[in-house]
Amino acid sequence: MRVLFYYRGSEHIGVQSIMAYLKSKGHLVELIYEPALGDNGYIDIPFLNKFFYNEKLLVDKAVRFRPDLIAFSIITNLYMPIKKLARKFKQVLPDVPIICGGIHVTSLPEETIKQDCFDMLCLGEGEGAMEDLLQRMREKRSYNDVKNLWVKDASGHIHKNDKRPVIRPLESLPKP
């Protein structure tokens, strides 16, 4: 399966870990990473920021990759711009499910799942949940009961699944 990850800001070990895990399971993963220099408080020159953030280029890259799944990791200060970008992705790739995780999602799942641009949430560790999700997608089976996921079905019902045990030892995961 083809998974497109998006992250903005600084490097993110959680995203890198999930990507490494999925690669080790044979999935093709791609990262759209934006340094977002204007977000850090050191560089705030609106004229220059437009050169570092180009929504059309991001959307074009997503379309070229042809993902089966789009994944976002969200921290609260980036919730609004990520929601805007997810809506753009949903417009051009309407049949591609969008999943998001991260500290914002774990802290505010009820608010996040209400958004029309997000199809599912991952609460807690994503490695096993993402692998189970992709396996079910490949087999064209329902993934409404995958642990660690909240899944919004076609009728709008939200399936809030239990959490899975944490991964121990962490050294069992591939290195990012």
PLM features per residue range, with description:
Residues 2, 31-169:
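Glycine-rich beta-alpha loop elements in corrinoid/cobalamin-binding modules
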Residues 2-3, 24:
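N-terminal glutamine amidotransferase
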Residues 6, 27-29:
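Hydrophobic, aliphatic-enriched repeat segments that assemble into extended interaction scaffolds
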Residues 7, 19, 134-138:
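Short, amphipathic alpha-helical segments that act as regulatory/interfacial helices
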Residues 7-15, 74-79:
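A short, glycine/small-residue-rich beta-strand->loop->alpha-helix junction that serves as a flexible
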Residues 15-21:
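Short amphipathic alpha-helix
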Residues 21-27:
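A short, Lys/Arg-enriched amphipathic alpha-helix followed by its capping loop at the start of a domain
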Residues 174-176:
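Pyridoxal 5′-phosphate
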